[in-house]
Amino acid sequence: MALPDFTMRQLLEAGVHFGHQAHRWNPKMADFIFGARNNIHIIDLAQTVPLMHRALQAVSDTVAKGGRILFVGTKRQAQDGVADAAKRSAQYFVNSRWLGGTLTNWKTVSGSIRRLRQLEEMLGSAEGSQYTKKERLTLQRERDKLDRSLGGIKDMGGLPDLIFVIDTNKEDIAIQEAQRLGIPVAAIVDTNCDPKGITYVVPGNDDAGRAIALYCDLIARAAIDGISRAQGDAGIDVGALAAPPQEDAVEASKTEGFQGLAGPRGVADDLKKLSGVSGAIEKKLNDLGIFHYWQIAELDSATAHKIGEEVGLPARVDGWVSQSKSLTADAE
């Protein structure tokens, strides 16, 4: 794998060079403006190309080190592209209204994520049929509301290591929170925006659908390149695989219904930190699709016991769950 290639022609065809009306400009963007045509500012793509490459390299390096990328784009024309790119690259996204404190008050947000998981479990299990129609509707509405806001980050397990933003004016709260926590920000910055405080500025049109689709595709491919590099460092030859790695149900008899991972998300956690887990037991857990503490922390007692039996340590598994919850909380 390698960083995604792109050309200036692609940027031109996507309309990346079109800024806003000249009277709406932010003077701090003057260095990135080529000129004006029909009272519309034209962005200097000769600067956009190297700056985009710099942002792509940062994304790839972050993921290669086991970091998380958070895509942020809540405007209508960015919502689908942001979600698709994040899912395709095994990253995370916010494409509905940004909740204040999503980053700076992660502990509270984690509580809401736990509630979302609880609702999904309640409505998806046999117990869900015990509720009246009205009760079930109320629970579904609560779940849907939480899913709109948190569905894209419910598996994140902690703060992101870099956020990628479409439209810095609209996502100013997200950017402020990231800056407060020292989280790098890569952003598409239009002619009406302020580039101050953005770690990786990419001058470009933040309104055109084709341009947004191009940005999201490039960032997603850079993240996939980072995953490939991380797996290469771990001795996994991605090119030799018969099919691309993807999350699917792990083959198991006793653990039927448990959804494992086909491979780690970034760098796998050291499961040998859990009491009684040797290298051999860790390999058995990996064979079941378990690579991270958060996976164990989320197990219900029945599934946890089945997994304990599968690896030959049923008496230890309750301790693993509590230890994993503690380790996950420490990471957050």
From Swiss-Prot:
Keyword Transcription regulation: no
GO molecular function: structural constituent of ribosome
PANTHER family per the UniProt record, alphabetical: 30S RIBOSOMAL PROTEIN S2 PROKARYOTIC AND ORGANELLAR (PTHR12534), SMALL RIBOSOMAL SUBUNIT PROTEIN US2M (PTHR12534:SF0)
One Pfam assignment: Ribosomal_S2
Keyword presence, Ribosomal protein: yes
Record family assignment: Belongs to the universal ribosomal protein uS2 family.
Domain of life: Bacteria
Keywords associated with the record: Ribonucleoprotein, Ribosomal protein
A biological-process GO annotation: translation
PROSITE patterns assigned: RIBOSOMAL_S2_1, RIBOSOMAL_S2_2
Protein name (database record): Small ribosomal subunit protein uS2
Organism: Afipia carboxidovorans (strain ATCC 49405 / DSM 1227 / KCTC 32145 / OM5)
